[in-house]
């Protein structure tokens, strides 16, 4: 009987720890999303500036910069389309943790590619 009580207490403790971990992961995912979203406006602005240069002497490079910005923007839109906060409530704690870890990793990769695209576009000399 004592062993059964100990196992039950252990399971309750694990569940609470898993829930806390999933809440922390969800906060990280949503926080990173909130950091990346304003870059969408920046991407649109940079793309607009570069569009005016896309027929110049360096048009191939400019088109690559534009393509990179478009890819970053599309990746963010795709991620938002596939991510569902609502579905998290239907998952058990371990599934939720696994899902959120994957989403956080995807967003970190997205952040790297977006930062790279934005930096390249910002440093291109606009005349």
Regions flagged by a language model, labelled:
Residues 32-70, 74-77:
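Post-signal-peptide N-terminal segment of Sec-exported extracytoplasmic proteins
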Residues 29-32, 36, 93-127:
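C-terminal amphipathic alpha-helix
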Residues 41-48, 52, 74-88, 112-126:
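Charged/polar positions within long, soluble alpha-helices
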Residues 14-18:
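Bacterial signal peptide processing site
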Residues 62-107:
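Long, amphipathic, charge-rich alpha-helical segments that form helical bundles/coiled-coils
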Residues 3-12:
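Sec-dependent N-terminal signal peptides
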Residues 19-28:
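PEST-like intrinsically disordered, low-complexity C-terminal regions enriched in Ser/Thr/Pro
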């Amino acid at each position: 009987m004592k062993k059964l009580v100990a196992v039950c207490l252990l399971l309750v403790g694990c569940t609470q720890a898993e829930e806390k971990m999933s809440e922390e992961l969800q906060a990280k995912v949503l926080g990173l999303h909130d950091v990346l979203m304003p870059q969408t406006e920046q991407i649109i602005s940079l793309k607009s500036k570069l569009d005016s240069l896309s027929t110049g002497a360096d048009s191939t490079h400019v088109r690559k910069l534009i393509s990179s910005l478009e890819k970053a923007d599309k990746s963010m839109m795709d991620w938002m389309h596939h991510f569902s906060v609502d579905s998290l409530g239907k998952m058990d704690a371990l599934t939720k943790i696994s899902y959120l870890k994957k989403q956080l990793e995807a967003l970190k990769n997205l952040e790297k590619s977006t930062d790279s695209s934005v930096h390249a576009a910002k440093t291109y000399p606009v005349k």
